Amino acid sequence: MRVAILGSSITALEYGHKILDKNPSTQVTVYTEDAEVGFPKTTFSEEVVLRDALRSIPDNWYSSIPTGIDREIPSTTAAFWLSKAMAIRLTCRGARFLLRTRIVDIDEDRCEISFRGGGLVGSGVDSYDVLSDFRGTRAMKPLDGSFRRAIRE
């Protein structure tokens, strides 16, 4: 099965991990306009209490997070590092990330995504079996836990 994930929010990354937990052979591709997962320049960010976040997700969903990141208070810095750690682990599990990639078109009848990006795969058309869009305000919908909250910077 081929799963296309649009966006790289914590919720999108959680979704990718859940898919791979259920079926490790799934081909997961994350398309994001961000240059680097975990450090997007947006005016709409998440705050997490890192201690609570790490308790609510499986250990195999994230890699190491620097010890200097405060784990007790809500912060966007903690959310950025958690996103980065979850993305790293997702790639270790076989997911593919297309960074600096803009979705040009989604053909739902053909189950195809047309994209243009700045990475190794500059542009193209990918087929998918499942498409999940976590861009914009959709990025803030929690899948299960409520360890984070949305803020405006």
Label each residue range with its predicted role:
Residues 54-56, 90, 98:
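Hydrophobic alpha-helix position signal
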Residues 28, 93-153:
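Predominantly flavin-linked oxidoreductase catalytic cores and closely associated redox partners
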Residues 7, 32-34, 135:
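Short beta-strand/turn micro-motifs composed of small residues
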Residues 69-89:
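Short beta-strand to alpha-helix junction loop
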Residues 17-20, 87, 91:
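Class I S-adenosyl-L-methionine
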Residues 14-70, 80-81:
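N-terminal FAD cofactor-binding segment of flavoenzymes
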Residues 11, 36, 139:
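Surface-exposed, flexible loop/turn segments at secondary-structure boundaries
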Residues 1-11:
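Beta1/beta-strand and adjacent pyrophosphate-binding region of the FAD-binding site
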